[in-house]
Design a protein with these regions (language model features):
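Rossmann-fold dinucleotide-binding core
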Residues: 82, 118-202
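Helix-loop-beta segment of a Rossmann-like dinucleotide-binding subdomain
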Residues: 107, 150-160, 207-213
């Protein structure tokens, strides 16, 4: 199976964990990030502390040197490295509207988007701009800590859910699992997303009260 060419919207904790893991597995990654973050990634690369995941047999922090991926400060520049097979979208929900605004001039160049953001409103918003055939619902239940730009730590390994309703779903599941991301397919995308949101509604206040992560 040919390697995927993947565009990542942002380089936050989830994007770095998933995109970085895919890059470690040999996929081609282009991270679109704010100019300051993109510059940092270009200079220092990425550091992924994945030692918690015993399947990886990683005794030390995994390092991605700057030559092993691309960091671009704008969507226009990132798209010059296309065409892409899929895009990762793991932004905070309050950043979705501005991200969609930036996408508007480039809708014809954008690939299907694997939407990993929390909540249930992001997929409909993306579909409204790009079409339902360009959206693949997904969830992340692993806990990731961010130490700095391109520097993350896997704090708790659970996995990733990917809706199996898209033609790319099977290939994505295979690629994600080859990257040790512990993916599972779900035929009911709405149930998958709502389950994650309800879990967050219960878990987040409890963790705050108990001072747990």
């Amino acid at each position: 199976m040919a390697n995927l060419k993947i565009l990542s919207f942002g380089a936050g904790a989830i994007s770095t964990y998933i995109g970085g893991s895919l890059a470690l597995a040999g996929e081609q990654l282009v991270f679109m990030a704010r100019p300051g973050v993109a510059d940092d990634l270009r200079q220092h690369g990425m550091k992924l502390d994945l030692t918690l995941d015993k399947r990886r047999d990683a005794k030390q922090i995994s390092v991605l040197n700057p030559a092993s991926f691309v960091a671009a400060p704008s969507l226009e520049e990132a798209l010059r490295y296309g065409p892409f097979d899929v895009a990762l979208f793991a932004l905070k929900s309050y950043d979705t509207a501005s991200a969609l605004e930036e996408m508007k001039p480039f809708t014809e160049k954008l690939p299907p988007i694997l939407c990993l953001s929390n909540g249930v409103d992001n997929e409909p918003a993306i579909a409204n701009l790009l079409g339902a055939d360009k959206v693949i619902p997904a969830t992340v239940t692993s806990a990731i800590g961010r130490r700095g730009a391109g520097d993350i730590v896997l704090e708790r390994l659970r996995g990733i859910g990917i809706a199996t309703t898209h033609p790319l779903s099977g290939q994505l599941l295979a690629a994600v699992n080859s990257a040790f991301l512990n993916a599972q397919g779900f035929p009911n995308a709405a149930a998958m997303k709502w389950s994650k949101m309800l879990t967050n509604l219960i878990a987040n206040p409890t963790s705050a009260i108990l001072d747990m992560t």
